[in-house]
């Protein structure tokens, strides 16, 4: 066992054979759209209202009480239940006014967010907090029941919590929705994409711009290679009518802002919603989003050629991808409310977390994040939870 209780395989790897749902953190103000570990002991999540909360994960958690009802999923199986009582959030990061599209962490200290309010913002966990504020974590549920009195549902008591507020330490102002955000493996460089087709490389620590170029559609999914020489950018126009739609996926020379490989024909009519480079730079994973089959492809970044396609698919589309810190495994999730762990070397499915809930509007998982040591995984659930699993413990 390591310090977090996860079983270590020979050579220091994490075992995925046994997984445990530790916590399901409730937060139902609006769709939870982004999630990130901030170091090993904190988790941050953002929602469609532009709110961001931070939880401190207890070292000695309290066991969860036995539920009065034995709720089953839509498939008839018993729902997986967390073994510990959920801690309450301790901080609210204030300043955003629109959807939080991405969250990431640098140096186990800095939380960085991208929003439809045209800004990137940085928060320092070591900074002092401000005034207290009161939140109702189940506000959306209460409001929905009040609006639909004919449903006969009984309104739950408000789940009130007091948090300390904290403004951003740094704000980078853009001009359009910032829909894409990713960070290089060495944490030195950010890549962003907006809905005007602007792609930008930034010095992560300073927040200063290094390079910018233009693509045709929304710069939707973006990623930068570990050597900082290549960038993946997927484009789309999310219009209703087929005649107005545009999709593209290209590999760019990050220094010159010129196309190295245009993969648009290979992935014709696919909205690539997620992308990630492996830590060694030898594999690029991309996932098809939208409402189609959520296919995942592993590519050779040097040639742009497809190495393999992973199966099974995420029904109704992929929403996020991330490599495990060991570089040997990939996590994926989508609108089917399932997280899958894959062996990158052979493309085989290693583990599946969560259960399908019956359709693409049955509480997607929007985003996933590994803890720095790779012993835990978090998923942002549209239903109003942040789920945290432990591997091996």
Q: What is each PLM-predicted segment?
A:
Residues 2-393:
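WD40-repeat beta-propeller superdomains and closely related acidic/aromatic-rich repeat-like regions
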